[in-house]
Amino acid sequence: MKKELLAPAGDTEAGYAALYYGADAVYLGLKHFSARATAANFGADDLNEFVGYAHSLGRKVYVAVNTLLQEDELPELLKALDLCAKYKVDALIVQDLGVARVVREAYPELELHASTQMAVHNREGALALQKIGFSRVVLARELTLNEIREIAAIPGLETEAFIHGALCYSYSGLCMFSSLETGKSANRGKCLYPCRAAFGGCDGEKHYFSMKDMALQGEVLKMPVTSLKIEGRKKTALYVAAAVDYYRRILDGRGDDAERAENIRQIFSRPWTKFHFNGRNKDVIDRDFVGHRGLKIGRTGSLRNNSLQFRTTHKIARYDGIQIDVPGEEKPFGFSLQSLRVNGRNVFEAQAGETVEVKLPPHAPRLEKGWDIYLASASEVKGAYPYEKPKPGAFRQRRQLDVSVMIEKGKLSAATGEFFFAVTGEFAKAENPDKTADAVRKAFGKTGDTDFVLGNLTIENPQGLFAPASLLNELRRGLYGQVVFEEEPRVLPAVKKVRESGAPKWIVKTDKVETLAGINLE
């Protein structure tokens, strides 16, 4: 089974980069109802053109409408869903069961994918969602390969699993840390990531909840899922390009390219982990440092005259950025290589295995031998992932407008649907009626910045008359200026009131079966 490679797009640039480097599908958010509310996200015009371009390549676009909604947001939700239906997105990624119901009842043409925010972690949860209309479930990140296999075996249900990117300390969708600590809820797309902060503990101030990044690398070939998902709607187009390129090569059988993996580390990465893929793993926290680390390239050596010597395990160049782990500091010490020397000579770049001397900036802390050094950014990598994107407007999705034009003595008229326009004039016999028809096609082919393009054009000119271009253009402007597409309103069925009678009932919530032993269920 060919697996889908699914890439993130926090903006159009990341989306185009993902498609260029081989993503089979892209997931994105709109300006509202996205669990990554602080990403740039997509407006209506962005969505229109991006979906049009992706579909021209045979790729898919999924829109994340994956926050929990409040009742007064329903009108705004319907506007967002109208856009998704109008531009024919391939699926919606949903967390709120109320949103799922709206989609089922008013937008049945849109597929439903269950967001990882639903924390689907077993066969029963997946079956329950399949029963209410979800065609795909995005699995919780915390699963082992065997647990994934069990869910993926459900007939008729697609499965999607994360393979690379940031991890949440809690289960996605169930975490209240940001909400309770800052008033900004992750389930409203506004997580402030307090889990990345330092907290006091038995080992002093450490980042006890700061997770490493997932990177399954070649393990993805073992996964029996429909779709392999890269996290990162807040990442740059460069990061998305590098991650997609890396996993595309693995899936296409071109191998696990170490150099491309190193490129990802230089663009953005925390320490990598396979998480629980091969069994429960406790080494998933980076307690000492938070944020981007980069690619480890050596350890601090001798220090003299405000310069540092070390043996690099990777090619480096002037103006690259390096970071040094400083024990006791929350963040590594980073600086740009303004000078680079090898064997006492100034060089622009140094190769792996060479001992280099670099000038430290004036604000450098006191360094000691043996501290880890990371390549945090490299000019060579920044230029390694060019990508193409279409000209603005080239793939804008527009409706086809069928037009009929009548040329008769004393009058030109044009009609489309319920709209009609006419101009008067004196029209002589045409020397070549075919040229008149060409002129009509040319005039009415100019649809400009409208929501439509010319579809079928019917021309009636029974007397073989000549019509000047100026009048044809006036006729076109008059007709096109009237055209307004009325969208068929979506109607939500009234919610039936449920009346219950009888004795009060108890609701018991427990995670231990033994608790039920002491309750009379008769």
Identify the residue ranges that each predicted region occupies.
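Beta/alpha (TIM)-barrel catalytic core signal, keyed to glycine-rich beta->alpha loops juxtaposed to Asp/Glu
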Residues: 119
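RNase H-like DDE/DDD metal-dependent nuclease/strand-transfer catalytic core used by mobile genetic elements
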Residues: 103
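Aromatic- and glycine-enriched glycan-recognition loops and surfaces
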Residues: 39-48
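Alpha-helix capping/helix-boundary segments
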Residues: 98-99
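Surface-exposed amphipathic alpha-helical tracts and adjacent flexible/coil segments at the periphery
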Residues: 1-21, 25-35, 50-51, 57-67, ...
